[in-house]
Swiss-Prot record:
It comes from Rhizobium johnstonii (strain DSM 114642 / LMG 32736 / 3841). The keyword Nucleotide-binding applies. This is Molybdenum import ATP-binding protein ModC. It is a peripheral membrane protein. PANTHER family: ABC TRANSPORTER I FAMILY MEMBER 10. The lineage of its organism: Bacteria, Pseudomonadati, Pseudomonadota, Alphaproteobacteria, Hyphomicrobiales.
Length: 355
């Protein structure tokens, strides 16, 4: 699947001028509120027309302003999941789900009802009414209804934004299964770096109506400039679970040439995972420290340094092929005599499991 999007649009004081190409998997449109993410997804869906541009899916033009092509939204065969579930209150969950079948093309061979129900863990909800469901359950049903329409592309516009942290944690594993167990490409809009780090294969960073960066999630989310808030800056790494220590509730994850220990998560050996290490949680030492509670102390070499306007220094660390980031004060940098190429020890206070 290849999706090509090019769009220019003037909306009152806001100007959109953005383009990207998406391949199979999950492509995240990431950025602050007001950056143009929802405007882009509405153009993809056929809910809005750009002043100039095109939307092409697998070589088929759906919108093309130069030739006047505009395929109506109901003929694009796209599934759309909004911030709110938008279920029919007078129908049971089963009826809400089967309603999606009415929009499937006659020749479409989509996922079966039973498979979607199992995939999203909603077997016990089928005879209930929407009023009896939690926010996370409603969103899972909304996703199931979209999938049962046999979409060529699934568009998800901030689907977790209205949920609290507990409900987000409930639904994220189901979105991972959706990504891993179906062949349906997804365009996922979010301003949450944690959601994007966990789900996305490719990231399109938007700012002020323009595409600022695009590429693999591992690369894009490890750039300090990607974070909308400096507290979110950090490195995203991929690894494999080596073991789980049941006594201490610690999983050991192997990276390219080192290991990290993650508390709390009972992960199966051999499982591929993503971990995120915030730059604010990486301390530096010129000699190996002793007598610390930190479990993860990695040998590294300084691969790059850049000063910021607020009196801090962003330091890029090469840990045997895995790149992590540290943010320290300019004073600390001077006292430690840090410089390009110097060997250093990185003390990691927090490792977040993303997938």
């Amino acid at each position: 699947m290849t999706l090509i999007v090019e769009a220019k649009q003037r909306l009152d004081a806001f100007s959109l001028d953005a383009a990207f190409t998406s391949e199979r998997g999950v492509t995240a449109l990431f950025g602050r509120s007001g950056s143009g993410k929802t405007s882009m997804i509405r153009i993809i869906a056929g809910l809005a027309r750009p002043d100039e541009g095109r939307v092409v899916l697998d070589g088929e033009p759906l919108t093309e302003t130069t030739t006047g092509i505009f395929v109506p939204k109901h003929r694009r065969r796209f599934g759309y999941v909004f911030q709110e579930a938008r279920l029919f209150p007078h129908l049971s969950i089963r009826a809400n789900l089967t309603y999606g079948r009415w929009f499937a093309a006659r020749t479409a061979h989509g996922e079966s009802f039973d498979h979607i129900v199992d995939l999203l863990g909603i077997e016990t909800l089928l005879e209930r009414s929407p009023a009896k469901l939690s926010g996370g359950e409603k969103q899972r049903v909304a996703i199931g209804r979209a999938l049962l329409s046999s979409p060529r592309l699934l568009l998800m516009d901030e689907p977790l934004a209205a949920l609290d942290d507990a409900r987000k944690a409930e639904i994220l594993p189901y979105l991972e299964r959706l990504r891993d167990e179906t062949d349906i490409p997804i365009v996922y809009v979010s301003h949450s770096i944690a959601e994007v780090a966990r789900l996305a294969n490719q990231v399109v960073v938007m700012r002020d109506g323009k595409v600022e960066a695009t590429g693999p999630a591992i690369d894009i989310l490890s750039r300090p400039s990607t974070a909308s808030d400096r507290r979110e800056a950090g490195a995203l790494l991929e690894g494999t679970v080596e073991s789980f220590d049941a006594r201490h509730h610690l999983s050991t994850v192997a990276l390219k040439s080192c290991q990290v220990h993650i508390p709390g998560a009972a992960l199966a050996p051999g499982k591929s995972v993503r971990i995120r290490i915030p730059s604010r949680d990486v301390m530096l030492a010129t000699t190996r420290p002793e007598g610390l509670s930190a479990l993860n102390i990695l040998e590294a070499r300084i691969d790059g340094m850049s000063s910021t306007e607020d009196g801090t220094v962003e330091i890029r660390l090469d840990c045997g092929g895995d790149i992590i980031l540290s943010r320290i004060t300019t004073l600390s940098c001077e006292r430690l005599d840090l410089r390009q190429g110097r060997a250093i020890f990185a003390i990691i206070k927090t490792v977040a499991l993303e997938a």
